[in-house]
Design a protein with these regions (language model features):
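Conserved alpha/beta-hydrolase "nucleophile elbow" surrounding the catalytic nucleophile
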Residues: 18-20, 80, 84-89
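Conserved HGGG/HGGXW glycine-rich cap/lid loop of the alpha/beta-hydrolase fold
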Residues: 6-53
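Flexible "cap/lid" loop of the alpha/beta hydrolase fold
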Residues: 97, 106-137
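Catalytic histidine-centered segment of alpha/beta-hydrolase-like enzymes
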Residues: 238-251
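Short glycine-enriched nucleophile-adjacent loop
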Residues: 89-100, 106
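Conserved alpha/beta-hydrolase catalytic His-Asp/Glu region
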Residues: 141-198
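Conserved serine/cysteine hydrolase catalytic core
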Residues: 178-225
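Conserved acidic catalytic loop of the alpha/beta-hydrolase fold
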Residues: 63-80
Length: 262
């Protein structure tokens, strides 16, 4: 199936892959800086953003990795740097593990899949989160002007929720509300974890926030599952979307990682 992929800037290709229930719009804070150095490709996964859900498309991370690779090949993008958040981080790890000749570097922002005990069922309350986003979508443009609404929607996502821009919040609510692929992706992750090796020739940086309530350190940040050569960073006052909370730090780490490729 064809994925919606947007392009910005010029230079070496760098591919950005969003998380579950999100969309390519999540990358807005870092696109301007990256597009000065790279040709930036932002991907909408199936049932997310501008890519419709295809019920025949397998939604596990390995299958999504193959789908992203196929779409990049069709665009003539053979070698590229990778940046992925949450589910997108897991998909990026799969791409690097299975196609090391195509990946020049990898930066994982709170990547999923690094858990010793895979999930066997969906998180309790996930349906409520999705339903709340759908119910608020039509009024979000107004309600997000109020501090109480912003707090309800983003307090568990970001310790700096008060500082998040109106645009980031509005985009996030819209992405979640429209993410028909949300539960198919959840089900595609069940009973799985990232368990492959990644070539030491590929520079890898893993970044987590110190306040990640979605993938907490105790259960979902198992370093033994990450590449042994990976640089591991914990950013202060940062939640599950480091590119929102620590934008400049994330940009700097991405730049540094890309410069290490051979």
């Amino acid at each position: 199936m064809k994925l919606s992929i947007q392009r910005y800037g010029s230079g070496e290709p760098i591919v950005l892959i969003h998380g579950m229930g999100s969309a390519a719009t999540a990358w807005k804070p870092i696109i301007p800086a990256l597009s000065k150095e790279f040709e930036v490709f932002t991907v909408d996964l199936p049932g997310h953003g501008q890519t419709p859900l295809d019920k025949s498309q397998p939604m596990d991370p390995s299958s999504l990795a193959r789908l992203v690779l196929l779409n990049l090949s069709e665009l003539g993008v053979q070698q590229f740097h990778l940046v992925g958040n949450s589910l997108g981080g897991w998909v990026s790890l799969e791409i690097a593990a299975t196609n090391p000749d195509r990946v020049k570097s990898l930066t994982g922002l709170a990547p999923a899949g690094l858990w010793l005990a895979p999930f066997t069922s969906r998180y309790p309350g996930e349906l409520a989160v999705r339903l709340m986003a759908k119910s608020l979508d039509k009024v979000a443009a107004t309600t997000l002007n109020y501090k109480w609404a912003k707090k309800i929607g983003f307090e568990t996502v970001s310790p700096r929720w008060e500082q998040l821009s109106y645009e980031i919040c509005l985009d996030a609510v819209a992405a979640m509300a429209k993410s028909e692929g949300y539960f198919p992706v959840w089900d595609g992750m069940l009973k799985k974890r990232f368990d492959k090796e990644i070539s030491a020739d590929i520079p890898v940086t893993i970044i987590f926030g110190d306040t990640d309530h979605t993938l907490p350190a105790k259960t979902c940040q198992e370093r033994s599952l990450a590449p042994k050569h990976a640089k591991w960073i914990i950013l202060p006052e940062t939640g599950h979307a480091p590119m929102w909370d620590s934008t400049e730090d994330v940009i700097a780490e991405i730049m540094q990682t890309t410069k290490q490729c051979k």
